[in-house]
């Protein structure tokens, strides 16, 4: 998400975590991307889905980011993508101890389904992508500590609604958040809830 991707200096979350823990941290955040796959036609060869969390994890597992390097995104806010993807391709994932996955706001914006009634590992759904991510990472890196971070509470000025009111097709944002929290608990995976617990959001003045 851009919450992480657009802040890459000493004030970034990765930099703060590195300062506090002494661990070497890398910010692999890519703004505007989704956790699950989003192509409406479900084309596995759709290259933009390779920068989703599900697509990136597949590359972590096979240790090959070649597909991501073919993605061409023209928006100026994504000018750091090329360098970030190049850096990810140089990381020795066998040495990675902790992986934070903070995503989901764009799944909500896209109206992606939360769950599939047919395939629990359907990566075109929010929960299916989480299950697939956890399964693949645990199979490839059994000692890796996986920590999900929920989307934050969000206001919209056009229309003037909060995420509690704004349904973009898949439900309100809290539906995604609660599904993520419940699923992570069921999978015995850590999750940090920044939707409910991070900052006050009772009134518009809190914005």
Which ranges hold each PLM region?
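Catalytic His-Asp segment of secreted/periplasmic serine-dependent ester chemistry enzymes
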Residues: 40-45, 151-207
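Oxyanion-hole/transition-state-stabilizing segment in secreted/luminal serine hydrolases
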Residues: 47-124
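Serine-esterase "nucleophile elbow" of acetyl-processing enzymes
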Residues: 1-50
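Soluble non-cytosolic domains of exported or imported proteins
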Residues: 8-12, 120-128, 167-174
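Active-site segments of SGNH/GDSL-like serine hydrolases
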Residues: 100-112, 134-173
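Structural recognition of the beta-strand scaffold that forms the well-ordered cores
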Residues: 24-29, 97-102, 145-150, 190-193
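Generic structural signal for well-ordered alpha-helices
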Residues: 130-134, 177
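Solvent-exposed loop/turn segments at secondary-structure junctions
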Residues: 2-5, 30-35, 105-110, 152-156, ...
């Amino acid at each position: 998400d851009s919450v992480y991707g657009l802040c890459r200096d000493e004030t970034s979350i990765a930099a703060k975590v590195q300062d506090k823990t002494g661990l070497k941290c890398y910010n692999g955040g890519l703004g505007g991307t989704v956790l699950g796959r989003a192509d409406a036609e479900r084309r596995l060869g759709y290259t933009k889905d390779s920068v989703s969390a599900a697509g990136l994890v597949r590359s972590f597992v096979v240790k090959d980011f070649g597909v991501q390097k073919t993605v061409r995104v023209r928006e100026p806010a994504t000018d750091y993508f090329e360098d970030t993807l190049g850096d990810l391709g140089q990381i020795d994932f066998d040495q990675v101890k902790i992986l934070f996955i903070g995503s989901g706001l764009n799944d909500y914006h896209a109206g992606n389904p939360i769950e599939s009634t047919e395939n629990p590992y359907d990566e075109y759904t929010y929960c299916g992508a989480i299950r697939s991510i956890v399964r693949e990472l645990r199979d490839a890196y059994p000692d890796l500590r996986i920590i999900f971070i929920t989307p934050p509470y969000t206001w919209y000025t056009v229309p003037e609604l909060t995420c509690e009111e704004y349904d973009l097709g898949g439900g309100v944002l809290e539906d995604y958040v609660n599904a993520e929290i419940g699923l992570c608990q069921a999978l015995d995976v850590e999750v940090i809830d920044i939707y409910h617990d991070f900052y006050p959001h009772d009134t518009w003045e809190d914005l």
